[in-house]
A protein has these predicted regions:
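Asp-based, Mg2+/Mn2+-dependent phosphohydrolase catalytic module
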Residues: 2-34, 43-259
Length: 259
């Protein structure tokens, strides 16, 4: 039986609106003996709230089966003084990090939110200039992810990758990306399932973050035609998925027949 990593946003829901068949698909995969881990770059809400949201959509899982980037950040940055430009809800997942306004060892950027007023607060010029000053003072730059955009019910929205790139350019330093598509993030998920990458699948809607990162680690990949999926992406993508399914609902049958 396979180890299967499942993206969340765009696979199970868009802006909280369920994509049909998600709960049933997870139940079928479990019944077939596959080991599952839910992997998300969502940095808007805490792991607890994200797990509750999935359960409300009919997807059965334990909180510990959900791997989020804030939890990964807490592990990597444990014991450090961190200036965090993140959404307030994820602070509960940053256990072991000392959050500071100045004198930071690290600057951590989180993801954007659908509510414009929160983005205006977190990614204001004042806050970005403060982060730049800390980087100039010797702090290291970390990003929960570097996504360009994400799909919402009202259309594509700019994500935090643009702000990360701006700080990288201004401070002339690369950011360490903690979420997908980083090898460390996928490695942690595979370790949790005790799986060799060659025996694992990554299922997602994001060609760059989901499929590209997984393929670079040696995993096989499946693209869903929901969420961020665009037909023209098939023509321009640098990573060719091993499979394409209409939605998460079609995954169990496809996996069962895959070579």
């Amino acid at each position: 039986m396979a180890a299967i990593l499942l993206d969340v946003d765009g696979v199970f829901h868009v802006s909280g609106e369920p994509i049909d068949g998600g709960g049933a698909a997870v139940a079928k995969l479990r019944a077939a003996g596959h080991r599952l881990r839910f992997v998300t770059n969502n940095t808007t809400h805490s792991r607890r709230r994200l797990a509750e949201q999935l359960r409300s959509l009919g997807v059965e899982l334990d909180d510990g089966e959900l791997q989020t980037t804030p939890v990964a950040a807490a592990h990597v940055l444990a014991g450090k003084r961190v200036l965090a430009l993140t959404m307030p809800d994820i602070v509960e997942d940053l256990d072991g990090i000392e959050l500071v306004g100045e004198g930071a060892d690290a600057v951590l950027l989180g993801g954007a939110e659908e509510q414009p007023e929160l983005n205006n607060q977190v990614f204001s010029y004042v806050n970005l200039a403060r982060a730049f000053a800390e980087l100039q003072g010797g702090a290291e730059l970390y990003s929960l992810h570097k996504n360009r955009w994400w799909q919402t019910a009202r259309g594509p929205l700019l994500d935090a990758g643009a702000f990360v790139a701006g700080l990288e350019y201004a401070a002339d330093m690369p950011a360490t990306v903690l979420g997908k598509p980083s090898a460390a993030y996928f490695g942690a998920a595979l370790d949790a399932l005790d799986s060799d990458p060659k025996l694992a699948w990554m299922v997602g809607d994001d060609v760059e973050a989901d499929l590209g990162g997984a393929a670079a680690c040696g995993m096989r990949t499946v693209l869903v035609r929901t969420g961020k999926f665009r037909p023209d992406a098939l023509e321009t993508m640098r990573v060719r998925p091993d499979g394409i399914v209409s939605s998460i609902a079609a995954l169990p049958d496809w996996i069962d027949s895959a070579p």
